[in-house]
Amino acid sequence: MGSRYPSHQLSNGLFVSGRPEQPKERAPTMSAVAMPYTGGDIKRSGELGKMFDIPADGTKSRKSGPIPGAPSRSGSFAGTAQSGPGAPMATGRMSGSLASAGSVSMKKTNSGPLSKHGEPLKKSSGPQSGGVTRQNSGSIPILPATGLITSGPITSGPLNSSGAPRKVSGPLDSSGLMKSHMPTVVHNQAVTTLGPEDDFSCLKSFPKPVLWLVVLIFIMGFLAGGFILGAVHNPILLVVVAILFTVVAALFIWNICWGRRGITDFIARYPDADLRTAKNGQHVKVTGVVTCGNVPLESSFHRVPRCVYTSTCLYEYRGWGSKPANSSHRHFTWGLRSSERHVVDFYISDFQSGLRALVKTGSGAKVTPLVDDSVVIDFKQGSEQVSPDFVRWLGKKNLTSDDRIMRLKEGYIKEGSTVSVIGVVQRNDNVLMIVPSSEPLAAGWQWRRCTFPTSLEGIVLRCEDSSNVDAIPV
């Protein structure tokens, strides 16, 4: 008996209504490899790397032309791209127009010749499938190896455009990044550069009119004593003047040699103030542990990082036929040939109150440093105990040794050192600061050391040699 509705029999013998289903082409099965961990490497991040125009690893090969054994698939698409190093086919840039509607084959097309790393030598931009056009104008920004997009040009900082450390001249060590950063730090306005005139000297604060008056009195005394000795043959006046001259000369020599020791004793006896009760504008002495501010320093010779004060001075001894180190260098004395002394703002944690204060020693502030030298190296050409580090440092600074007798002195205050600071308290918007004083601090006579009265200008920094002492970690 016929029926208006068509029916068909299934494979199990059951009759159902409707026409039999047309056999469909089975969709191709594509296997995918699990993406490995890239570790943040932008060169191994597939599509993100292509977006920023970064080539893949050189070990991956690129192929041009149709994929062998790729089945056709219905739909409109412009090709596929596999990302990551685990894909069976390496990534490539798509250029040109691919077939749109209908059954098309999956293709990857690279235009132009390939380099030895499998990378197109010439990038081309053109219309994509589906009428979508991609145009690149100008240079595409390059990401560092970390894949982080940050503000500012990529050339600023210790990394180059590929994310690797910048190459600097000289031997490479663990502080290579700081070496490339040091020239910008030294010329920073926040760094105070100290000269020879900023160093402490007892004779610098001695009144010059008094000094010349004493010299004039002794000259007149010697002339009068010599005249009396020649006229009446009486040497008493000449002997008295000679004894007084010897005493005064010995006192001056003593102050030149031991005047610094006297002023350090004065600072040690100066009472520490409590920052909690210190008034605004009060002269205080604070002792505590220092912490670097925004601009840390590095010593020139030993490359000690994270310092708040550095001093590297090269001296030369001028003999009878030696060359002068500077224009005012006299014979048979040590003259300053090279000086690198810098200080910046830093923080100090007071031992008594526990408060943290900002010490304003940077930005051209007046500072009187009393820091012991951590390194003293004597150099003489032809000596068997010549330091190779010292010779290398001379070459880096473009300083010749010749046959000169030289001495290198380096001192520094590194982070975590214990420092005594004398300055004026200033409170500004709940920020506790120690700033330079407008008037010098008078030390007066130091009878225990037999030193002349002297004065200390600006902020006084006192730190003993801490090269052999472990700094407090901060």
UniProtKB/Swiss-Prot annotation:
Annotated TM spans: 210-230, 236-256
Entry membrane topology: Multi-pass membrane protein
Phosphoserine: residues carrying this PTM: S45, S169
Record keywords, A-Z: Membrane, Phosphoprotein, Transmembrane, Transmembrane helix
Main location: membrane
InterPro entries for this protein: At1g16860-like (IPR040339)
GO cellular component labels: plasma membrane
Polar residues: bias regions: 1-14, 73-83, 97-113, 125-137
Any single biological process term in GO: negative regulation of cellulose biosynthetic process
Region (Disordered): 1-137
Subcellular location: Membrane
PANTHER family (alphabetical): OS08G0230200 PROTEIN, OSJNBA0035M09.9 PROTEIN
Protein name: Uncharacterized membrane protein At1g16860
Organism: Arabidopsis thaliana (Mouse-ear cress)
